[in-house]
Amino acid sequence: LALAIHRSGQKDAPVLFVNPGGPGGTVVSALPYYAALGLGESVVKAYDIVALDPRGVGASTPVFCMTDQERDQRNAGEDTDTADDNPQSAIAEVKEDSRSLADGCRSHSGSLFEHIDTVSAARDFDMVRAVLGQETLNLLGYSYGTFLGATYAGLFPERVGRFVLDGALDPTLSVNEVSALQMRGLDASLQHWISDCA
């Protein structure tokens, strides 16, 4: 796991974990931004800010899904859009492609692949909390970071400190349902923008 800490300068300052969402983006490399602009001076002076790249993300041990040669072959493949001709066929194609990609990730990443999930990420946060000598975990989570925070709270309710969860995801929705809602929202915004420009 890759970890970065921005020190407040105070001795024995409490720790604030930051997760900007994703999943899939690095937090470690974004820590200077959060410390300089994103959190506000009062927060940066009061807390040591911790950025932790979850397993498979950013500077943590990566997940490999294919060799360079396999990636080149995949990227050079025929790019056809069959959705207009036969939507059901296109859905089946995407599902098969996703299954194939997951199988490649599993075979190229070994046992790590089976532990790339939100529960494992929450457990990793708890391990780092303990290593840093903190009785509770303080978290600022955005988007997917809210789901990670809710998962942590479900696993370790007695260790929840101060949580700010902004832009919360509905944990009862599937990834497909979240994506569909997001697409409808983006489309509505685009239609309003087009209307304003007319």
Regions flagged by a language model, labelled:
Residues 4-198:
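Gly/Pro-rich cap/lid or specificity-loop segments adjacent to the active site
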